[in-house]
Amino acid sequence: MVDQTKQTTHFGFRTVAKDEKAGMVAEVFHSVAAKYDLMNDLMSFGIHRIWKRVAIDASGVRRGQRILDLAGGTGDLTAKFSRIVGEKGEVVLADINESMLKVGREKLRDVGIVGNVSYVQANAEALPFPDNYFNCITISFGLRNVTEKEKALRSMFRVLKPGGRLLVLEFSKPLFAPLSKAYDAYSFHVLPKIGQVFVQDAGSYRYLAESIRMHPDQDTLKTMMEEAGFEQVTYTNMTGGIVALHRGFKF
């Protein structure tokens, strides 16, 4: 008898077949890609830029290194890493979603970021790169959309060089009850309305709120990273735990 729990996963609060989730997530990001950056600024009041700056500072990236910006979307981190690694370095912006990758490529080329950046459509669960290839991997607000998170973490571990580090920047669990209540009210009542006004799509932003609630909390994700092989795993809470930055090393 087939264990149905092994064949299903969550899409927001809904239970769906595992082989259907990737397509459903793809539709969300096809819908929002064109105004993704605008919506990030509106939804976070611009604070996402600070969260990403913290991640960049924690990356330890240096000139000449090879970086994977996984689920890199419109290229915010890639743009910064491109300047840091310089001409002899390389940044790979990888995303499973063709629409997001197209927006990211056009955005970076429009501001003259070329030469040391390449673009790859890739599934985090089966990364198409050699073993021990990257000095640093970042995945920013992308892991919660992955169907098989454990599989993706193992794939990241495989392609990371010994001595390299993984940084996972993701929405997490607020630390304080009053903040959690206010955050819930904002997420479930305000975000969908913003989505409806600016991209005529309340459903995608309802999914965003639900997917955040279904994502593992800080300590659970830390354990998942350790089980995938990462060592010295730590995390830093930001904005009261609304976002957490996890960091782990491969030795």
Swiss-Prot record:
Query: EC number(s) of the enzyme?
Result: 2.1.1.163, 2.1.1.201
Q: Give me any GO biological process, just one.
A: aerobic respiration
The family note in this entry says: Belongs to the class I-like SAM-binding methyltransferase superfamily. MenG/UbiE family.
Quick one: which pathway?
A: Quinol/quinone metabolism; menaquinone biosynthesis; menaquinol from 1,4-dihydroxy-2-naphthoate: step 2/2; Cofactor biosynthesis; ubiquinone biosynthesis
- Indicate what this protein is called per its UniProt record: Ubiquinone/menaquinone biosynthesis C-methyltransferase UbiE
Residues annotated for S-adenosyl-L-methionine binding in this entry: T74, D95, N123, A124, S140
Matching entries from HAMAP family are given as: MenG_UbiE_methyltr
In its keyword annotation, does this UniProt entry include Oxidoreductase? no
- Reaction(s) this enzyme catalyzes, per UniProt: a 2-demethylmenaquinol + S-adenosyl-L-methionine = a menaquinol + S-adenosyl-L-homocysteine + H(+); a 2-methoxy-6-(all-trans-polyprenyl)benzene-1,4-diol + S-adenosyl-L-methionine = a 5-methoxy-2-methyl-3-(all-trans-polyprenyl)benzene-1,4-diol + S-adenosyl-L-homocysteine + H(+)
Per the entry, what this protein does is:
Methyltransferase required for the conversion of demethylmenaquinol (DMKH2) to menaquinol (MKH2) and the conversion of 2-polyprenyl-6-methoxy-1,4-benzoquinol (DDMQH2) to 2-polyprenyl-3-methyl-6-methoxy-1,4-benzoquinol (DMQH2).
Gene Ontology molecular function, alphabetical: 2-methoxy-6-polyprenyl-1,4-benzoquinol methyltransferase activity; demethylmenaquinone methyltransferase activity
Span of the secretion signal? none
The record's keywords, sorted A to Z, are:
Menaquinone biosynthesis, Methyltransferase, S-adenosyl-L-methionine, Transferase, Ubiquinone biosynthesis
- Supply the Gene3D superfamilies for this chain: Vaccinia Virus protein VP39
Record-linked InterPro entries: SAM-dependent_MTases_sf, UbiE/COQ5_MeTrFase, UbiE/COQ5_MeTrFase_CS
- Source organism of the structure: Photorhabdus laumondii subsp. laumondii (strain DSM 15139 / CIP 105565 / TT01)
Q: Please, which domain of life does this record's source organism belong to?
A: Bacteria
Pfam families for this protein:
Ubie_methyltran
